[in-house]
A protein has these predicted regions:
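NAD(P)H-binding glycine-rich loop region in Rossmannoid oxidoreductase-like domains
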Residues: 2, 7-8, 34, 39-95
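N-terminal Rossmann NAD(P)H-binding glycine-rich loop of SDR-like oxidoreductase domains
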Residues: 5-27
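Active-site-lining helix/loop region of Rossmann-like oxidoreductase modules
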Residues: 10-15, 130, 139, 157-159, ...
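Residues in the short beta-alpha loop(s) of Rossmann-like NAD(P)-binding domains
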Residues: 13, 38, 107
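A generic structural motif
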Residues: 28-32, 196
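Short beta-strand "acidic-cap" motif of Rossmann-like dinucleotide-binding folds
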Residues: 32-34, 150
Length: 216
């Protein structure tokens, strides 16, 4: 690695976050702060490079404390209060002066998924999920942070890294993508901090077009 950064991972117990953590430890020299609601659920894999911090992402003060000295924030968050979490993250980052944010969202927040798959996606995700993730994304996009929104297709646990991307305003491609692929994309964004700055990026596995993911 040509540089070493201090990374704060929010929602560090998530599946994608754990995969990204593993890749960051194996392939980079970055220092990691793992932030999650219950610290007992996660053990540090490398005490020299990792610190586990317990906190709630809606608690701006605990976020501000965790953000001290951080270069890049990677947020792997979920829940019905995702919009409130987004507001808290933006506020804390602005207060401390941290600019770079990688935020995992979901496909469909702009109604960008075409055809029968788009209809199926609405049927599966409308009624609270898409709406809250769209609202959270709007909070991030309306901030002056140096953000990248990542919009994964339906997630699989396949042991492959294979993905392509689409930009906001383009029709979403494919139906699915592996968590391992999203983790790999996140690590690339961390290693190239200027990449996809203030962009919202759809991520899918190539050649997975269809009416729904293969595992449905």
């Amino acid at each position: 690695m040509l540089f070493m950064a201090k990374i704060l991972i929010l929602g560090a117990n998530g599946k994608i976050a754990k995969l990204a953590e593993k890749e960051l430890l194996e392939k980079t020299t970055h220092q990691l702060t793992l932030f999650l609601r219950n610290a007992d659920r996660l053990k540090s894999s490398d005490d020299k490079r990792e610190m586990v911090v317990e906190g709630d992402t809606t608690d701006t003060k605990s976020l501000e404390k965790a953000l001290k000295g951080i270069d890049i924030v990677y947020a792997n968050l979920a829940g019905k209060n995702i919009e409130q979490q987004a507001k808290s993250v933006v506020t804390a980052m602005n207060t401390v002066g941290v600019k770079r944010l990688i935020w995992i969202s979901t496909l469909g927040i702009y109604d960008e998924v075409p055809g029968n798959f788009g209809k199926w996606n609405h049927q599966m995700l409308d009624g609270g999920y898409l709406e809250t993730y769209a609202a959270a994304a709007k909070v991030i996009e309306n901030s002056d942070l140096d953000y990248t929104l990542v919009r994964p297709a339906w997630l699989s646990n396949k042991d492959i890294v294979s993905y392509e991307t689409t930009e906001k305003g383009e029709p979403f491609k494919g139906t699915e993508v592996s968590r391992k692929s999203i983790a790999d994309f996140v690590v690339h964004l961390i290693n190239e901090p200027d990449k996809e700055s203030r962009h919202s990026v759809g991520v899918n596995q190539p050649n997975t077009d269809g009416d729904k993911p293969s595992f449905y």
